[in-house]
């Protein structure tokens, strides 16, 4: 039985990660932002923990809670889309802060505090990023603030792989596909079950050679 930590588990991809890992008999710790959103996680059999990723003190306190854990798999899934559209326009300060703090700053705060628990088990760390964050695959201007945030998240994950890979932690950035969630919309390509099954399959097979890679849910390696 593995110990699995899902950050941002109240709905969508995060909730499906919880559902599938619990169904396999794993011990799952799942974070959510508000007390009300923990009920569904508890019913699934996970251990819910309230965590506001934008609260630096809360992140440090959470790290203390994890200090005695051995985490086999940690998935940082929390994220926001921000303004949509094709136009390259100046982002407002509130939009910029909301997207960059949630998608970049929060994971950068979390990764170092989770590292000891991952190192202890030679575990695996994944961030749910997006193909839209790839510089080499960029072909349009849609959602440019979101793109920038995911490019920064990719850089953070790649940097973490250089720090923690030599200590036995496999670090991966995922493109989950275009998924039918609140963020992806109803016309997206795949359902959340298919996306998470693919990412879980990759995590199960991941080894030292997977460290620092950017991988599609279907196993395709993506360029940064």
Regions found by a protein language model. Give the residues of each.
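Structural signature of the Rossmann-like NAD(P)-dependent dehydrogenase/reductase core
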Residues: 6-7, 76-77, 124-130, 170-175
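Rossmann-fold cofactor-recognition segment
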Residues: 43-57
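Conserved glycine-rich Rossmann-like NAD(P)H-binding loop of the short-chain dehydrogenase/reductase
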Residues: 21-39
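Conserved Rossmann-fold cofactor-binding substructure of NAD(P)-dependent oxidoreductases
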Residues: 53-69
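C-terminal helical subdomain
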Residues: 166, 173-176, 185-224
